[in-house]
């Protein structure tokens, strides 16, 4: 039962930056627990990001582990212009003008990167600058000049390009800028796995980006970053359209009272869980680790509470992008997650009940309950798009989920989904064959062992998304050997280990012949056999030639077969893959 105890359910998103741009650091943070790597398109050039993408893909290949790449678009962040001396200091009571005119900033005025400033911001509106460090109120508006004449209510320092927020004011600004469109096309061309849209306000913003992605022929899922009050007011409609959510607590805490953010975080997580879409909790989770090797106790509690709330993933920003301890930050987050999850399993915490009636929902919920009742080592899902795995995940089963898919992009995307370990397995003609191949891969990766119980779920209509309607329980059997298969399909039977023709004098019809090599003395036994296993490797050996002539499946080149396989044991031969299993394994 090693898998159930060791697999961390909560995923970790790490932001790539100067501190983690080398191959050695990328490898280290992935090995420490990062499952998705975020590229922040507010910084860096396309050449920088292209280099990062290539390094991530190469490192993931070397580690034999799917790693998702999340492209985070900058969005229409409203900012100040540049000051003639780089910065100014404002005091409470100072008068200050914000204008849409292109002027160089002084002690009295600064331009702002929004054209319709004077038309849409009313008198009396509160304006927050530099994440709320400076605050002012609009006293007068000059629409002809495009000026907002303000009074400073909270003083402080302002410098070039600092952000500006208008809490409670409805602006007609679009969620995607021209830069975002260029960045999106670049990201799609580079094969990113997720795209995060910043400053989402309404469902139309999501429709726009999805239509853009669709027009390129791609199917990249979109994450809605919730950081505007308008998005909160239309939460259900926004979340129903996106493929994932990010609780962007930085700007959200400026747009809304800071004390509201924890409540909104819980609401967003609960809604995303119910809808079965992954949710990331982000911003300042381990912020002190930018410069310190250990987090504060409050930060540990913040990460822990997000996990207890039900977040799929927790995110590191500056901690891994520019921090002094990026690997330690990832490892710390992984340790917190493992400890909290251990406590959750021990205390049998609540599991989601989805009131929407559907066959996939009922199957997905039942799979978790069956796995827990039977003490299964894993739940195994066959999925073409990731939908089956996500559906099982939303019910938060205590048993780990192995998501079997033939598509590498789906495997990467599932690295953002709670409790899911993706396995890349080539699609085979039948569901049973694909499950058996997946069990083999899981055994090779030490995720499953002989005797483990696995609860399987899939759709009987292979390749059709959303058709989950099958539950199957199976015991993992050992792979006794591997060689080269000659023939078709799979056969099961009782092993008859023979070193000479005399050893098969009482050979029964349907038995499987196991021998170092065969000769003319074995022909009568071969006529009765359902299969042949030999240690001899040649494809033109006696067993291979006679087996093909008589239509008997053969696996040649199975090393030490006569030593490993016990006489009288039940075996299954998977001829297509050249595998010999212990026990009768169904591969319909």
Pin down the residues of each PLM region.
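Phosphate-interacting basic helix/loop segments used at nucleotide- and nucleic-acid interfaces
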Residues: 47-50, 55-63, 67, 107-135, ...
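Structural preference for beta-strand elements that scaffold enzyme active sites
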Residues: 11-13, 36-38, 66-70, 95, ...
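ATP-dependent carboxylate/acyl-activation modules
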Residues: 94-95, 236, 269-273, 280, ...
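Short, ordered loop/turn segments at secondary-structure junctions
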Residues: 16-18, 34, 41-44, 73-76, ...
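Conserved glycine-bearing catalytic or ligand-binding loops at nucleotide- and phosphate-handling centers
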Residues: 32-88, 188-193, 313-336, 340, ...
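Conserved alpha/beta-domain cores
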Residues: 6, 14-18, 169-283, 289-300, ...
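Expand to "…catalyze enediolate/carbanion chemistry for C-C bond making/breaking, isomerization
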Residues: 1-18, 22-23, 30, 45-50, ...
């Amino acid at each position: 039962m090693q898998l159930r105890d060791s697999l961390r359910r909560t995923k970790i998103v790490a932001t790539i930056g100067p501190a983690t741009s080398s191959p050695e650091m990328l490898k280290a943070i992935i090995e420490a627990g990062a499952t998705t790597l975020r590229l922040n398109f507010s910084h860096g050039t396309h050449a920088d990001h292209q280099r990062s993408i290539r390094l991530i893909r190469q490192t993931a290949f070397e580690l034999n582990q799917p790693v998702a790449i999340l492209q985070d678009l900058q969005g229409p962040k409203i900012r100040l212009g540049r000051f003639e001396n780089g910065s100014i200091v404002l005091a409470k009571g100072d008068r200050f003008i914000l204008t849409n005119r292109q002027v160089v900033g002084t002690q009295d005025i600064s331009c702002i990167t929004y054209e319709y400033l004077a038309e849409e911001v009313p008198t009396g509106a509160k304006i927050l600058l530099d994440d709320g460090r400076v605050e002012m109120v609009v006293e007068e508006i000059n629409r002809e000049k495009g000026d907002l004449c303000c009074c400073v209510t909270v003083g402080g320092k302002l410098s070039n390009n600092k952000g500006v927020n208008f809490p409670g004011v409805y602006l007609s600004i679009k969620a995607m800028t021209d830069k975002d469109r260029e960045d999106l096309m670049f990201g799609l061309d580079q094969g990113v796995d997720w795209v995060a849209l910043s400053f989402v306000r309404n469902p139309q913003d999501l429709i726009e980006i999805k239509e853009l992605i669709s027009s390129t022929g791609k199917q990249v899922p979109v994450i809605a970053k919730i950081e505007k009050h308008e998005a909160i007011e239309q939460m259900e409609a926004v979340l129903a359209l996106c493929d994932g959510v990010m609780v962007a607590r930085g700007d959200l805490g400026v747009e809304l009272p800071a004390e509201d953010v924890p409540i909104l975080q819980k609401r967003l997580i609960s809604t995303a869980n119910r809808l079965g879409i992954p949710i990331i909790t982000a911003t300042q989770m381990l912020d002190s680790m930018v410069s310190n090797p250990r987090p504060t106790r409050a930060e540990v509690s913040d990460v822990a509470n997000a996990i207890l709330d039900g977040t799929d993933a927790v995110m590191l920003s500056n901690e891994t992008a520019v921090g002094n301890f990026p690997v330690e930050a990832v490892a710390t987050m992984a340790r917190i997650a493992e400890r909290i999850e251990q406590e959750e399993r021990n205390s049998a915490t609540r599991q989601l009940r989805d009131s929407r009636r559907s066959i996939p929902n009922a199957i997905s919920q039942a799979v978790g309950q069956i796995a827990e009742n039977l003490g299964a080592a894993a739940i195994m899902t066959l999925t073409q798009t990731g939908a089956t795995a996500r559906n099982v995940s939303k019910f938060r089963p205590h048993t780990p989920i192995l998501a079997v898919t033939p598509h590498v992009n789906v495997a990467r995307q599932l690295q953002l989904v709670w409790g899911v370990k993706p396995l890349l397995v080539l699609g085979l003609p039948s569901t049973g064959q694909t499950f058996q191949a997946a069990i083999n891969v899981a055994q090779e990766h030490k995720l499953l062992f002989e005797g483990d119980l696995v609860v399987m779920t899939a759709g009987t209509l292979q390749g059709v998304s959303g058709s989950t309607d099958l539950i199957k329980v199976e015991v993992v059997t050992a792979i006794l050997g591997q060689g080269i298969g000659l023939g078709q399909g799979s056969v099961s039977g009782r092993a008859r280990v023979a070193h000479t023709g005399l050893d098969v004098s009482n050979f029964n019809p349907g038995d499987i012949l196991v021998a170092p090599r065969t000769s003319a003395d074995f022909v009568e036994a071969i006529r009765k056999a359902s299969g042949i296993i030999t240690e001899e490797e040649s494809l033109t050996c006696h067993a291979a030639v006679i087996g093909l002539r008589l239509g008997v499946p053969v696996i040649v080149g199975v090393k030490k077969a006569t030593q490993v396989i016990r006489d009288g044991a039940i075996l299954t031969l998977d001829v297509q893959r050249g595998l010999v299993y212990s026990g009768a394994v169904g591969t319909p």
